[in-house]
Amino acid sequence: SKKVDVGFLPPTAYTLAHDQKAADVLLQAQRFGVNKDGSDSKELTKDYKSEILVKKDSGIKSVKDLKGKKIALQDVTSTAGYTFPLVELDKEGVNVLKDMKVVNMKGHDQAVISLMNGDVDAAAVFNDARKIVKKDEPKVFDETKILKLTKPIPNDTISVRSDMDSKFRDKLKKAFKDIAKTKEGHKVISEVYSHENYVDSKDENFDIVREYDKKVKEMK
């Protein structure tokens, strides 16, 4: 349908729409990077990572140690909470769907809390989801560690209808970049979407998402 001209699409939704010739990427969101202690860095990045968290006292020292353990995952459409962790653990010899017990979670915060409560042995979440539960779980950074970080995952897109003319695309690009620079506009995109800025993007930035989606389908 041609009702929507512009959309904020996460990576997987964008690749599906693009491959059906329905959407083209216009811009990619920038967010603050993450320091080792989980705090925001001053640097803006156009991608982020997924992390596998375990308790420090769990005795889990390597990916291989995850076999037979319980892992908290998000819905199958989640890039950071499902797709990327599954593929990267599989590369290291652990097929999550066969070698582990999967516990489905609604929300990355819930996954971290389940790990803290001992309901699961590991949690696949975005880096660093621990900071969103720190208020309720003040010891989260002391008691957990990152077992593995994935390859970078592209941030959300601003995508447009694939038949939109280039002049209008350029106007939209400028408009979104300008909005991000105004005080009021920045406040909205930061509070609603956790976006800080927008940069030009191209379709090939999302090839890794296609590759990983394909690999997950082959794993089942």
Range-by-range predicted roles:
Residues 12, 30, 41-113:
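Bilobed "Venus flytrap"/periplasmic-binding protein-like clamshell domains
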Residues 160-220:
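An extracytoplasmic/periplasmic, membrane-proximal ligand-sensing/linker region
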Residues 49-60, 153-166:
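A bilobed periplasmic-binding-protein/Venus flytrap-type ligand-binding module shared by bacterial periplasmic
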Residues 11-22, 85-91, 116, 121-142:
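A ligand-binding cleft/hinge motif common to bilobed small-molecule-binding domains
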Residues 3-8, 98-107, 145-148:
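Short beta-strand-to-loop elements that line the ligand-binding cleft
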Residues 1-4, 9-12, 21, 47-49, ...:
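Extracytoplasmic
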Residues 23-45, 101, 134-152:
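Short beta-strand->loop
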Residues 1, 66, 115-116, 172:
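Hydrophobic residues within well-ordered alpha-helices
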